[in-house]
């Protein structure tokens, strides 16, 4: 498995986890818990953005990985 495909797989997993966190954020009624979920969503978004940037670099360096 190439680095690019591992990054793509990690991104997909993280986006799924982010979706779950988002669902939990909407469903919870406790303010403190909602704050924790919101903070976790922000962290997940930052990581997703970092990985997407890294993937762009990988695809630029190795064009054969683009779109796979």
PLM regions and their residue ranges:
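Generic helix-packing signal
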Residues: 21, 29-32, 44, 48
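Long amphipathic alpha-helical coiled-coil segments
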Residues: 32-35, 60-68
